[in-house]
Amino acid sequence: NKNWIYYYDNNNWMESYSQDIPSARYFHAMANDWNSDMIVMFGGYGLNDTGFYAYRNDTWIYYADRDLWLEISDAGGPAPRYQHAMAFDNITGDVILYGGYGMNETGYYQRFNDTWAFNIQTQKWNKIDTPINPGKRSYHKMAGDHGGNIMMFGGYIDGVGYDESTWRYREGNWTMVESTTHPEPLRYHAMKHDREHDLIVVFGGYKLSAPYYSDDTWVLDGTTGSWALIETNTTPIARYY
């Protein structure tokens, strides 16, 4: 459970020496507040307080300017889970969480179709009831743009399997985005916002067809919902996770 910091200005990684850090885990999710140096982390699968492996529902904030982790013990929030996705909402200033796989209130394991918003100021989670949603889903990824469009792609849906639909969350509502061109069904891909061009970039992932590892680069416009496959002169080797 080490913490590393990447510094853009000198292209260098440095190990953090924060004393109180989250326990070792995987398949957690994180999102950074664009207006500050804070990063919000929730959930994952790893050691709990009694030393057993379990789905986690703890919320942590990392203050990059102070190299400090702080657990928000009274944040409330989603049920224990992993394989969920989180993204920053540039309009509300909240961090939005959707879906994942874990344990519900009755102790049964399931995929989730719930939407939550973490308020940076109050440091509380609030459940968002939406008219429709992208289904009980895990392994998906999300990223937001300057206009407050939080885009979701890929993952695994109960009753459907691995998915290739694109969804937009905006102002408390989910809508499916129709596009004739888009990536094939993916899981374990990376999805991040290009702040300079205000576009969302997807790279890699695990496909349903051979060769199973992807090295494709896709760009998504959050406003129009249009996808474009980018041909680059050089590319990282195909990968997932």
Predicted regions, residues:
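Kelch-like beta-propeller repeat domains
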Residues: 1-241
